[in-house]
């Protein structure tokens, strides 16, 4: 009976992981440096350092303000740093807009958030991100 229960638990965990992975979007991330205020979403109100500026597609005229995203580095976008990823995942809060044409990524992470998932020397990385 215990073996059957373990199989059910194992299957359930696998299913959750597959569904989580299946809903992840892909894109690129860059980073910006302090000061982080003022921001488009919160003005002069500090929101910490695990924050991000969203590209116009995600920002959606401010609808994404305050939303949280789990971001994982999946690899390099250039040959400068062939293995930039640290293996970590970071959760960030959208506090700002990364406007075109200057925005070079899907999500512009704070320097601290970017550094937790990748080598800053890479400058730009491929990512998977999921709203949490």
Regions found by a protein language model. Give the residues of each.
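Secreted/periplasmic proteins
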Residues: 2-132
């Amino acid at each position: 009976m215990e073996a059957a229960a373990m199989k059910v638990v194992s299957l359930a965990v696998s299913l959750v992981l597959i569904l989580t992975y299946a809903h992840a979007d892909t894109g690129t991330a860059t980073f910006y440096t302090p000061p982080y205020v003022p921001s488009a979403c919160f003005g002069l109100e500090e929101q910490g350092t695990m924050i991000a500026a969203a590209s116009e597609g995600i920002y959606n005229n401010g609808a994404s303000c305050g939303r949280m995203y789990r971001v994982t580095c999946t690899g390099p976008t250039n040959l400068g740093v062939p293995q930039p990823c640290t293996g970590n995942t970071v959760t960030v809060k959208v506090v700002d807009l990364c406007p075109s044409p200057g925005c070079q990524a899907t999500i512009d992470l704070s320097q601290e958030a970017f550094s937790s998932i990748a080598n800053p020397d890479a400058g730009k990385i491929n990512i998977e991100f999921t709203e949490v």
